[in-house]
């Protein structure tokens, strides 16, 4: 029995020493990669954003292209449903890995409200743009480059009209995202369903006017592949302004027991939440 106890203690010492050495190696690796923001979990997030944006664009823009090439067999409501379902499915597929942004405007909105690290923003945006461009390229190879098959977004009216509706619909989208995905009081399991339904509604509303982009990557990807840049600024400025405004609007109503001046001075809403929880427990 004594021998067994000694053996166990020796193994425990080796395990502790090995764990300590591994911890030091991980700490050194984290310090060495801090400036580059390169780690295995981060790379996994980037890959998830690439795949998520790719499949979202392939499904949504694919529906647009097929509907145009097959004399409207899918129909406009059908296209809206495809966009909503594609978003919902991909949120549930990779949301637990990367947060399922798939949208530079959403990522920027989270960063400005203190819910996403600024240093990771460029990599996320590049991943989203890459996924959107690759999906657009795939569709171009499959269906050709005829102008009537262009899966991008173009205003049907004035640029101002399209800009305003892009701001409003993206505001609506980001407001919903902030509510269902970042508020602990919300039912997180329904996030994908709520966001997908919001996309569906927005496409039905804004589709005939602006194409219902709500996402710079959704418009820039097809534009890069097709070389069609008409009014592209509308689909960059509109979603960015709408998303940032939507995120901040929800954050203003999130802290109902804090004075407005304290909310606006806070640079990190997560830190504010931590302070509120600490005060409540005290």
UniProtKB/Swiss-Prot annotation:
The short motif NPA 1 is annotated over 103-105
Provide the disulphide bond pattern.
none
Keyword Transmembrane helix tagged: yes
| Subcellular location as annotated | Membrane
Pfam name, any one: MIP
Q: Name one GO cellular component term.
A: membrane
Gene Ontology MF annotations: channel activity
Q: Report motif location: NPA 2.
A: 215-217
Membrane topology term reads:
Multi-pass membrane protein
Residues annotated as coiled-coil are none
Key word Iron present: no
> Where is the chain membrane-spanning?
46-66, 74-94, 125-145, 162-182, 186-206, 232-252
Entry superkingdom = Eukaryota
Its biological function? Aquaporins facilitate the transport of water and small neutral solutes across cell membranes.
Name the family: Belongs to the MIP/aquaporin (TC 1.A.8) family. NIP (TC 1.A.8.12) subfamily.
Q: What is this protein called?
A: Aquaporin NIP1-1
From which organism does this entry originate? Zea mays (Maize)
